[in-house]
């Protein structure tokens, strides 16, 4: 189901949409902040869409490289599919478990595409914006909470990169930017 996935792009999205991400903040959400995270709120993808998810295509990690991570933190992944999760490592994966991973990129993000991300924030959202965090909403943010949305704090993306932001779309990106994404 990953036929339209562009390995050289950021998470399948064109490089032009991800100019200001910082490699130093790769993990984004700290483990202790994920307590209220629900699998049905991951990037707006419902569980019914996760059935077609191919763990072997996840950011270049092979399915045999997944294992001890809590299923509640990974949504569609069972504990048996996430063997070597290391919360202290980059993105939760130990470097020696990243054989199928592109050494010149971090989670699919090229090092040269990562600059203005706020490492002290959660997934790009400053703590004051997290007060409105709703684990049952798309990506954790309900439309009614988007009033406090700070485009410059989201993954460090500048306003220019946030033009196409659509809170009702998958992962916040408009359908016209989801061309390479196949949820089914």
Q: Model segments located where?
A:
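General marker for long, soluble alpha-helical cores
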Residues: 1-184
């Amino acid at each position: 189901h990953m036929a339209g996935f562009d390995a050289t792009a950021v998470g399948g999205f064109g490089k032009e949409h991800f100019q200001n991400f910082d490699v130093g903040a790769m993990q984004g959400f700290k483990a202790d902040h994920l307590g209220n995270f629900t699998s049905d709120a991951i990037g707006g993808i419902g569980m019914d869409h996760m059935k077609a998810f191919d763990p072997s295509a996840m950011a270049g990690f092979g399915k045999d490289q997944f294992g001890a991570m809590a299923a509640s933190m990974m949504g569609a992944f069972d504990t048996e599919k996430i063997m070597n999760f290391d919360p202290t490592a980059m993105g939760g994966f130990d470097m020696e478990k990243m054989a199928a991973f592109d050494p010149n990129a971090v989670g699919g993000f090229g090092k040269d595409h990562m600059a203005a991300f706020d490492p002290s924030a959660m997934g790009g959202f400053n703590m004051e914006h997290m007060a409105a965090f709703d684990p049952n909403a798309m990506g954790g943010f309900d439309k009614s909470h988007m009033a406090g949305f700070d485009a410059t704090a989201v993954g460090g993306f500048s306003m220019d990169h946030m033009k196409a932001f659509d809170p009702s779309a998958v992962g916040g990106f408009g359908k016209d930017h989801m061309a390479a994404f196949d949820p089914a």
